[in-house]
């Protein structure tokens, strides 16, 4: 199934309902990459990544929410949606604009679905996985921090991620929605929602000099310009 095809979402949902009679879990996991720096890559390659990594999860979720709502009203336990993101979507990485853009959008979609489905008690959460997948092994030739990141992550079993996905669909996870989790071997962590870290104000509009002065006062709260490789350069709990 080409998840980026226009009718793929409806086709997948129809097949699942026909085979199992209901939909208890939707996992948006399919993803592709197109490594290129901005200004060097092709637009069609960038758009292909967005269609697979972001539009396809939207389409599959859109096709599934109707049946999931109806079966919940009929008395079935509410289902769940789990979106699989990436640390690149949170931190960025040079040469990975397409993945970063699509996976950052997936986090916004996760929050929005959680809000829209709260009345039906259908949960939607996202997971940022660190595991020895084909994508990690495909990094290939690398040196320095990227090589160390690849080698550390390659030791982590993907089953750790699968166990959390299964839990988020279980009755014990009732009430957990709109959250972003990370799985790195035997370590599970929750990301905070982005919120203002500091602020400043004045009675009138800021001019350029006043902006400069105000932002100097906020500088201690600026986010570090570190990519995911730098942020997770320590040894995982494998």
Kindly give the residue locations of the regions a language model identified.
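Active-site-adjacent segment of SDR/Rossmann-fold oxidoreductases
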Residues: 91, 107, 112-122, 171-174
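Residue(s) in the substrate-gating loop at a strand-loop-helix junction
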Residues: 86
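Active-site helix of classical SDR
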Residues: 61, 102, 110
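C-terminal helical subdomain
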Residues: 126, 147-238
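The beta1-alpha1 cofactor-binding region of Rossmann-like NAD(H)/NADP(H)-dependent oxidoreductases
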Residues: 1-11, 43
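A glycine-rich helix->loop->beta "capping" turn
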Residues: 15-26, 34, 75, 123
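Substrate-binding pocket helix/loop in short-chain dehydrogenase/reductase
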Residues: 37-47
């Amino acid at each position: 199934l080409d998840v980026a095809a226009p009718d793929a979402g409806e086709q997948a949902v129809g097949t699942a309902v026909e085979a199992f009679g209901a939909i208890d879990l939707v996992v948006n996991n399919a993803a592709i990459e197109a490594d290129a720096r901005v200004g060097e890559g092709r637009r069609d390659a960038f758009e292909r990544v967005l269609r697979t990594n972001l539009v396809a999860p939207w389409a599959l979720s859109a096709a599934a929410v109707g049946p999931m709502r109806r079966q919940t009203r009929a008395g079935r336990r509410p289902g769940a949606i789990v979106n699989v993101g990436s640390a690149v979507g949170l931190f960025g990485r040079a040469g990975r604009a397409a993945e970063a853009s699509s996976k950052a959008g997936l986090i916004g979609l996760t929050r929005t679905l959680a809000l829209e489905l709260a009345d039906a008690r259908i949960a939607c959460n996202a997971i940022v996985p660190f595991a020895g997948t084909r994508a990690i092994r495909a990094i290939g030739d690398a040196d320095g921090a990227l090589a160390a990141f690849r080698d550390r992550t390659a030791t982590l079993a993907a089953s750790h991620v699968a166990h959390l996905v299964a839990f988020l669909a279980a009755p014990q996870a009732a009430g957990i929605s709109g959250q972003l989790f990370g799985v790195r071997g035997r370590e599970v962590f929750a990301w905070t929602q982005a919120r203002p870290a500091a602020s400043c104000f004045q009675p009138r509009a800021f001019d350029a000099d006043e902006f400069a002065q105000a932002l100097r006062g906020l500088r201690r709260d600026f986010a570090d310009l570190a990519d995911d490789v730098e942020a997770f350069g320590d040894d995982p709990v494998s």
